[in-house]
């Protein structure tokens, strides 16, 4: 009897242990399922902010950050902690303007300010974008020439044609989802920076210790870094895309309809913006570090060709046969993919601005025949940008010049963003907070000062 009782007790204990283990596994699976759901919800939040962040590291940005690393080593890393909060605040304000008004930036300026301010704002962004389109198309053609012996002009025309056809016949939302994955090639820079072996105390010291020099070349590249990070086209694109995203989700019937901006919606907007701008800034920081430790460290202080820029990635593929060719391939895929992503953003940004200023129907969600003027501006911007490549301008130098011009053009536009974002009549209870006001105004002051110093140093050379 005692033996039977003992066997029963042991069986019961074993059964309890198995039940407990099964419960723990069930809880674990449940938690995993919840984590997957949370992860999926997080991915659904990411939209215009992520695309804007990816487009921020366009070919012009890659060239400018690469030149900063090659020319000055770690010497300009201090710019990133300065630019990062400015970028976050400015782009959050732009996205919020779109979310609250249901309109693009140009439409808001048109309704609330003078025509002089409207045409100045639109004119600046269109000129800056057109130059940027030309430089990006040139960079895509130049990197392709690393592999095929095809005339530069023919390649530039081919890419312009591909982009125009994609914009007209394929939903930008669909092909942007694919092209965003090509941005993964930018991870080659952080990996290269880690593989080369950095003096990390020196890197962080250079990052958090401001040590500006006032010679023309340093100021020129610094203004370029500001301009390619805080770019005019991002202001107009992010504002309009925030509205178009809501139209695509059927939360709005059309652009111009006032959205129901809940606290959750604005929280998601800020999260999307934060993720996009943080990834863009971190990637840019690593590009400078990678080029400093590969190009600058080996005496290559001037990037004259796409092949020069690609050499920064050679340590990543050192063990591969034909490492130089593989490095060029990784670099080219990144430049071409990001160019295909960025050029429609640039042309679309110009088109939103012009269409809103003239009262045309606009939106990438509309079919071509329902927004002919809007798509005509996209086509014209791309073709005029293409034409710049026939002026005999060096494509690599054009990329850096584009970034500098963006820095100059951003100054008056930042003033307008601060003005609109702080206007209670326009924004109601969602106007800029105290911190947002301080940071956006600081962005205006810093970029104005940098541009003025650039002009003064240029005049002193002459």
Language-model-detected regions and their locations in the chain:
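Membrane-interface "cap" regions at the ends of multi-pass membrane proteins
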Residues: 2-60, 245, 260, 264-268, ...
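Juxtamembrane transmembrane-helix boundary signature
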Residues: 52, 79-112, 120-131, 345
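Flexible loop linkers connecting adjacent transmembrane helices
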Residues: 64-69, 92-117, 142-145, 249-252, ...
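Extracellular/periplasmic helix-exit of transmembrane alpha-helices
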Residues: 86-95, 100, 240-248, 260, ...
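Hydrophobic transmembrane alpha-helices that form the core helical bundles
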Residues: 96, 100, 118-149, 156-160, ...
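Loop-to-transmembrane helix boundary motifs in multi-pass membrane proteins
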Residues: 115-116, 153-157, 320, 337-340, ...
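Transmembrane alpha-helical segments of multi-pass small-molecule transport proteins
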Residues: 122, 147-169, 185-194, 370-384, ...
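Hydrophobic alpha-helical segments and their helix-loop junctions in multi-pass secondary transporters
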Residues: 184-211, 222, 227-244, 416-425, ...
């Amino acid at each position: 009897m005692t033996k039977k009782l003992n066997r029963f007790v042991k069986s019961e204990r074993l059964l309890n242990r198995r039940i407990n283990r099964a419960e723990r596994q069930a809880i674990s699976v449940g938690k995993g399922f919840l984590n997957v759901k949370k992860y999926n919800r997080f991915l659904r939040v990411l939209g215009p902010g992520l695309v804007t962040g990816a487009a921020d590291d366009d070919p012009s940005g890659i060239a400018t950050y690469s030149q900063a690393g090659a020319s000055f080593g770690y010497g300009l890393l201090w710019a990133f902690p300065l630019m990062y909060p400015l970028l976050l605040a400015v782009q959050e304000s732009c996205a919020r303007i779109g979310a609250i008004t249901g309109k693009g930036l140009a439409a808001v300026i048109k309704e609330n300010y003078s025509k002089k301010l409207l045409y100045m704002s639109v004119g600046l962004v269109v000129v800056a974008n057109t130059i940027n389109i030309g430089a990006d198309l040139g960079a895509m053609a130049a990197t392709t020439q690393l592999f095929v012996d095809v005339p530069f002009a023919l390649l530039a025309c081919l890419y312009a044609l591909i982009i125009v056809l994609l914009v007209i016949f394929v939903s930008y939302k669909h092909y942007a989802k694919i092209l965003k994955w090509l941005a993964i090639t930018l991870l080659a820079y952080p990996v290269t920076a880690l593989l080369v072996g950095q003096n990390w105390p020196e890197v962080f010291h250079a990052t958090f210790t401001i040590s500006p020099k006032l010679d023309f070349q340093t100021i020129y590249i610094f203004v370029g870094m500001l301009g390619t990070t805080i770019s005019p086209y991002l202001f107009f694109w992010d504002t309009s895309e925030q509205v178009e995203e809501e139209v695509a989700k059927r939360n709005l019937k059309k652009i111009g309809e006032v959205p129901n901006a809940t606290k959750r919606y604005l929280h998601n907007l800020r999260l999307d913006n934060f993720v996009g701008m943080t990834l863009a800034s971190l990637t840019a920081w690593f590009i400078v570090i990678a080029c400093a430790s590969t190009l600058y460290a080996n005496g290559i202080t001037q990037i004259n060709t796409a092949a020069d820029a690609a050499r920064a990635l050679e340590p990543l593929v050192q063990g591969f046969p034909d490492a130089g060719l593989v490095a060029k391939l990784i670099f080219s895929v990144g430049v071409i993919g990001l160019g295909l992503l960025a050029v429609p953003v640039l042309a679309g940004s110009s088109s939103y601005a012009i269409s809103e200023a003239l009262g045309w129907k606009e939106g990438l969600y509309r079919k071509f025949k329902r927004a002919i003027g809007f798509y005509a501006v996209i086509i014209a911007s791309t073709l005029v940008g293409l034409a710049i490549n026939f002026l005999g301008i060096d494509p690599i130098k054009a990329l850096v010049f584009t970034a500098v011009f963006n820095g100059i053009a951003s100054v008056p536009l930042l003033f307008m963003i601060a003005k609109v974002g702080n206007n209670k009549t326009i924004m109601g209870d969602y106007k800029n907070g105290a911190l947002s006001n301080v940071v956006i105004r600081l962005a205006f002051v810093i970029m104005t000062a940098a541009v003025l110093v650039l002009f003064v140093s240029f005049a002193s050379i002459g």
